[in-house]
Amino acid sequence: ARSFQGLVCLLFASKLGGNILKEKRLFVCQQCGAIVPKWMGRCPECGSWNSIVEDEVLPEKKLAGTYRSPQLLQDITYSEDERILTSISELDRVLGGGIVPGSLVLIGGDPGIGKSTLMLQICGNLSRTRKVLYISGEESEKQVKLRADRLGISAGNLYIMAENNMNLIETAIKELKPDVAIIDSIQTVYFPELSSGPGSVSQIREATVKSLRLSKETETAIFVVGHVTKEGSLAGPKLLEHMVDVVLYFEGERYHAYRLLRTVKNRFGSTNEIGIFEMRDRGLVEVTSPSKYLLSGKLKDAAGSAVACILEGTRPLLVEVQALVSRTGFNLPRRQTSGVDYNRAALLIAVLEKKLGYMLGQEDIYINVAGGIKVEEPGAD
């Protein structure tokens, strides 16, 4: 009798909702996006370990829309004046000449590097002539106001919203119709329809899809802030980077003043541009002559110091490379690098020993690039 009652309840529930028996769960690789039927320790497609996570699929919905007939390419017109200038020349250069209306821009970086500071400064500049909406999923309205006062941002057409529910965020953007909206961050927003928590693969994917659709429908340029993993890549599925129009990385050492804004993907401009900033107590300040700042503390004719010319994007930079060699007190010598790839430094040490005859097997070697700049240019060898 009990089993019969349970069967009746299950059939009744499926008749009413239909979602209990239709709930779909998949397993997706966060590195390559491959879908597998069950959890595996190693992805069969890309070979990465511990990258497969459980994913949840939203119930299918019928999307309403109007049919738009195809247009000839030569009949489509646009103007370069449509780009929105932020009055931050380093950022405008990286974006290819300003913000494109209706674009979706993703910016990632380490914790405390200055992503939220940069976003709030963009809001302050644009709010003088444009309508801007700043959506914070990590701070309250009062906390954002406190940070804005510290940065010296005056009141304008800047609206603040502390919200995590993506459905309410969609309603706010459609009602306010801002020129630029910022979501800080994509890992904190969620859909209540999904049982998984904020930051999961399914939540990030659905939030990105919704943001992309909103940007195209409302012609609102949307910035989304993304967290990074300990390996330095953006947290979440790789699909996140594929869907957005622009991907920016905010780099630099947290305890150094200089920051680099690097373009990884840009559908509206070059990916060979970088922006250089200096973090001060009043926020980020543009660095128009980076070589002058990077070499300002260099001592003349100092031992263990050399100046290297590297190419960051399309801009040549002069950086100071420092090296220190001392006798080791252990069986294995210590090798430590900052701003230089460790494997490349090991290769150079091997060349010095093999070709130039330097005996470095009993020496500790420390290599540092002044200013917190990361050097990847082979010409700096």
Regions found by a protein language model. Give the residues of each.
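Detector for small/aliphatic-rich hydrophobic stretches
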Residues: G18-K24, Q30, I35-V105, S127-Y134
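Substrate-engagement module of ASCE P-loop NTPases
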Residues: S202-F223, H227, M243-R254, E353
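Terminal-proximal interaction/regulatory segments of ATP-powered molecular machines
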Residues: A350-D381
